[in-house]
Amino acid sequence: SRGLGDVYKRQTSTWATLLGFMLLLAACGKSAQVPLQAWLLDAMEGPTPVSALIHAATMVTAGVYLVVRSHEIYAHTGAASLAVAIIGAVTLLFGAWIGSAKKDIKKVLAGSTMSQIGYMMLAAGLGPAGAALAIFHLLTHGFFKANMFLGAGSVMHGTGDDTDMYHFGALSKVMPMTFWTFACGYLAIIGIPGTSGYFSKDHIIEAAFDKGAVFGVLALIGAGITAYYMTRLMMLTFLGTKRWRADVHPHESPAVMTIPLIVLAVLSIFAGAFMNNWIGDWLAPATGAEVEHVGMWHMGVIGVVTLVVVILGIVAGWLLNRHNVPNEEPETHDPLLVAGRHDIYGDDINDVVVVKPGRWLAGGVAGFDRSVVDGLVNGAGSVTTACSQIIRKVQNGYVRSYGLMMVVGVVVVGLVVVLGRMA
């Protein structure tokens, strides 16, 4: 009985692990997680409302939802859960790396989205409580990231569809509503206490430290880099000196664009506090665990350390981008910066690992189809045609030929009979 039970448990664990890895692969493609993240940067060619709704709030985060809703499977496999957490930790750092290197305001936000979803995926791999935090951050992130994507669209509207942050500067003076609403999203994403991001993302960092120091430190480093590149975005876009092109006359967007920004800015600040006291209980039936409630201004040791790291990131972003900002992106030979500008060579890796082998395989299959499959089909037709050409010569219309064939046939039959009797 015990032996059968052990076999059942092993089989359950094996299948759960396999299913967990397959679901994780699907989630990586859906939510732009390493190594299937390259498409998200290219998707920034679409309109900013699409980015706000689909890339920040709904479609791209669906992979996180998939993993969380599959928690019953991951509960039976520590290996797959660990893989989810590792993918999330790597992605949150890679996304922050990309965001720190880009000059395009939308691609900075795309790298940021990739990084924040990495936080969600990390949380989803930390167990039931982490899964609840993943959904919590998914909701708050939808508000402040949609706010910033629409804010980027407002900046583009006011600057002639330009997305190069080196062509901006001092836009807070001519676009005050866009600036202040964007600033609310900025405060939320870096996790200033009291904002939505503080309640959701800082919970994830604390949960990561509970799981292990490695995950906690990686999440903490990501928080510092996030503060840096978002401060860089604010400095290059809204603060400092103006660097507008001569034919550009920045102006504030109309009310039809700023009113949604105001609504999302309010949610960016207050939604986390509003959901903090009930989100865990609400998600408990789906995730299997409650989330510990944290008071508005309660901050443990990890929270204090996180705030210090965030402040250091803010200071670094301010010091490195407050003076002598050029009108064009400066050239660099820094390998880290170059890699970030090239999306950490995601497209190149895909070309080597997927595209070229895929073309080689497709060429081999096409050659097999031409030479073997078509060869058999066409060969059978050719043989049939050749045989018919031979046989048709027998039917030549001459009686003497038919008589000869009859004689030959009788002789052959006679030989067969005689030889058969002799045998």
Enumerate the language-model features and the residues they cover.
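Hydrophobic transmembrane alpha-helices and their helix-loop junctions in integral membrane proteins
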Residues: 6-256, 267, 273
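Hydrophobic alpha-helical membrane-insertion segments
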Residues: 185-189, 260-277, 359-363, 411-413
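Positively charged, low-complexity/disordered segments
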Residues: 1-5
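Hydrophobic alpha-helical membrane-embedded or membrane-associated segments
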Residues: 60, 145, 224-227, 264, ...
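Hard-cation-handling environments
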Residues: 240, 250-314
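Hydrophobic membrane-targeting alpha-helices
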Residues: 66, 155, 233, 316-320, ...
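Aromatic-capped, Gly/Pro-kinked transmembrane alpha-helices
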Residues: 279-301, 319-423
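Hydrophobic alpha-helical membrane-embedded segments
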Residues: 145, 224-232, 309-328
